[in-house]
Amino acid sequence: MSGAHTISHLSAGLKSVNIGDQQQNEANLNLLQQQLENEATSQTQQSRITQFFAQQPSDGYTLFSHRSAPNGFKVAIILSELELPFNTIFLDFNHGEQRAPEFVTINPNARVPALIDHFNDNTSIWESGAIILYLVSKYLRDNGECALWSDNIVEQSQISSWLFFQTSGHAPMIGQALHFRYFHSCPVPSAVERYTDEVRRVYGVIEMALAERREALIMDLDVENAAAYSAGTTPLSQSRYFDYPVWLVGDRATVADLSFVPWNNVVDRIGINLKVEFPEVYKWTKYMMRRPAVIRALRGD
């Protein structure tokens, strides 16, 4: 029996297992060594965050994220699309880096993502939707235009509606479905079913919106066959424009679309097959996944 195994069962099995003095001392030493190693690792992790905040860069952006956090990659996609200079610090949750006092000063919720804008007096922003709106609004102000956003207040409101739908309905429901499927302390089938059904409802909303955009696109571009499509004698799937990309707002990809990418990329883990169940969502996601900035961001570049 290894020392680690002995220690892990020590308190529960002490009355039934006869441990000699030498074995007891070895167990205690092993336990102490493990505690010291954990403390040293924790100090190293904390010092990494402390050192960063003590010597912040003078320009660019710093994104605080996590390797398994879709919302962090969501912000990385927008930074990459806008070609903004940024560095990502992937926090180590196992050692509590998200609870480091310096990090909590910029995100009182102690979660990722959070962003520091070193161009703007180290301004910090937290919550993915707020970060995205900050980035595109600032980009529009500084450059006069922003393809991912709009200078039209009506279009801005439409983009914002989808962005808030993603942050309040899409991401949390997938997150809960993942939690109850894989991480909850005991099986709760009703919770898995409830959240998975809600994810499907959310995708139904997006599917309908994209299908309406596709129909409008085909009717606008495929003029010679428009009457047949309207009469129902020729299905829209016969149009040469059936696989053209369509977007939630306007004729281009915006943050309304791109904010969905990282979560769409993991939804198969809760048993939802986008290609089969939501073909428009699948095509839409496929178009976005091919964008060079999206590829770079999802790689963690």
From Swiss-Prot:
Gene Ontology cellular component annotations, sorted alphabetically: cytoplasm
Encoding gene per record: URE2
Top-level taxon in the UniProt lineage: Eukaryota
CDD domains, alphabetized: GST_N_Ure2p_like (cd03048)
Name the UniProt record assigns to this protein: Protein URE2
Entry annotated with the keyword Cytoplasm: no
Natural source organism: Meyerozyma guilliermondii (strain ATCC 6260 / CBS 566 / DSM 6381 / JCM 1539 / NBRC 10279 / NRRL Y-324) (Yeast)
Subunit relationships: Homodimer.
GO MF annotation terms: glutathione peroxidase activity; phosphoprotein binding; transcription corepressor activity
Task of the protein: Plays an important role in the cellular response to the nitrogen source. URE2 gene plays a major part in the repression of GLN1 and GDH2 genes by glutamine, and is required for the inactivation of glutamine synthetase. URE2 gene product may catalytically inactivate GLN3 in response to an increase in the intracellular concentration of glutamine.
